[in-house]
Amino acid sequence: YMISSTKLRKAKKSLEETEPYFNALRNMVSRVVRHLPDVENQYMDVRPNKAPEDRIKGFIVVTADKGLAGAYNHNVLKKAMEEIEQCKNYKLFVVGELGRQYFKKQNIPVAEQFHYTAQNPSLHRARIICEEVVEQFKEGELDEVYVIYTYMKSSISTEVDMINLLPITRDMAMQHEMERQGVFNEEIELQPSPNALLNNIVPDVIMGYI
């Protein structure tokens, strides 16, 4: 479906207002992981003893509710199919009616309880989605969680992107970014503990991505 210029401006304004908060949380996680390499946390559990063929990957696939947006939906669904074809075990969490109907026609199961439209996105809905996948990760029902979506580079340019949400990894790219900003070394003190901090802010970071 066509997106009106008013809706587009509203969406961009909302993104601009929330991005600084989200980036601050994401940077805090990166700083903790960077400065405390020995920290262990439930969200950093890569489950090294689990064989690749036994790992369960969860994919949050974000599509539209209608099919008039051309490549917007096609490219996301194509990327999702490429990923699940390489997996023995996976779960699909589909946002958007078009995506659900597509996988249904392909006889590919999706999480039935995960029934969300793409219309009127909100932080409340993002939190519910986040809680669902985070709980399954903590319970060992998922070993990795990704989100596949359309990244809007500009009002006329988009591309498909896939982000690894869980487990949290030690991303060296963030270290390079901090060095670019002139942050080479710093002392940080975390209260009550690094583990408690990560338990509190990692779900918010994941919700921010969603």
Regions found by a protein language model. Name each.
Residues 1-210:
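C-terminal beta-strand-loop-alpha-helix "lid" module of Rossmann-like NAD(P)-dependent dehydrogenases
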